[in-house]
């Protein structure tokens, strides 16, 4: 009813009106058709009400059972593009069972502290033995991760592996001609152990290096040129809006909330290799494609991750370098001191972005502590992480959205988080909240692999 409509007169309740039977039109078939029609109408509710009720209950039960079947894929793989469930054995088997062939992606990964190569086959992840491994197979593996080339492939003793990486193994089928090895999950066979006692490690890109380091950034320090060479300024119609992280010559990681509703590539430019946003000589790079996570939840900021593809590749130098992605199953302990950077406001409430790049050291905080009722009260999901000080004073702020949270491991800087949200800036019991990159490695690599194939 519209605001200007007269108030409706309340009609006495009847099952006829409830089920729309008052609207039935019955053609007369006898001289006393009007009386017959009236009689039929009076009988319909009583006659059909039990049937209608039973029908509705059956429909509800059918829907519930159907949804239960579709969404409860226990022990199976659920296609993201539909409600279809397939057996795990059908994933990465060379046959596209899901729409758009999604079950034939995410079939290769690099895992653990040692960057061990694993292949998904026969319903589980299995570690690649170095037996029958040839160096040029690394190109195939890296292509399945979305990288156009590789840097190095080495071997590591099985005894040096973390427990989950020495349970199941595969090797390349040595009977296959080299030109037939175009996808690792089509080219391996399962084995109980590695005869050589060694497995394959893989590095697809030279990353995570910088020239030294010297507290966002509220409580932060001004950064030096080349100190955070993967830092990107994402500019919407010429104005800095968010931060990002360079991971390849073509790809930038940022937050989905930065690009949601602002997803036209031509409206964006990227600048890298700079500290000052004012009078800087750094060229602007055009954006070709923007992809944000399909399950991004604006109200809860879940799945807050996006990728930008540049129209042309970056040229790496001392001022521009990619940061490493972490490996699958790689853990970063609570309390580990990591670093966040960006052009965010340096004072809470200041509003404007800082004209110069700042950085701050922030310790990682467990999700258990971050979900305490006095902190974020249970809204932090496993795909998020917190970093900062519960006492306040140092944090990432507006303008740092999408920017990097990096940790150093074995002399390499790794992208552990992308700045997502927080309450205020550097407030007590309100540390910064970041998208946990390890939770989205499969998604990142799938987007890059799909693009590489086009």
Curated annotation (Swiss-Prot):
Keywords: Autocatalytic cleavage, Deafness, Disease variant, Disulfide bond, Endoplasmic reticulum, Glycoprotein, Hydrolase, Membrane, Non-syndromic deafness, Protease, Serine protease, Signal-anchor, Transmembrane, Transmembrane helix, Zymogen. Residues 109-205 form the SRCR domain. Residues 1-48 are cytoplasmic. Residues 72-108 form the LDL-receptor class A domain. Residues 217-449 form the Peptidase S1 domain. Disulfide bonds join 73-85, 79-98, 92-107, 129-194, 142-204, 207-324, 242-258, 338-407, 370-386, 397-425. It holds the Pfam family SRCR_2. Expressed in many tissues including fetal cochlea. Isoform T is found at increased levels in some carcinomas. One of its GO terms (biological process) is proteolysis. Changing residue 103 to G: In DFNB8; fails to undergo proteolytic cleavage and is unable to activate ENaC. It is an enzyme of class 3 (hydrolase). It is a single-pass type II membrane protein. PROSITE patterns: LDLRA_1, LDLRA_2, SRCR_1, SRCR_2, TRYPSIN_DOM, TRYPSIN_HIS, TRYPSIN_SER. It is found in: Endoplasmic reticulum membrane. One of its GO terms (molecular function) is sodium channel regulator activity. It is linked to Deafness, autosomal recessive, 8: A form of non-syndromic sensorineural hearing loss. Sensorineural deafness results from damage to the neural receptors of the inner ear, the nerve pathways to the brain, or the area of the brain that receives sound information. This is Transmembrane protease serine 3. It comes from Homo sapiens (Human).
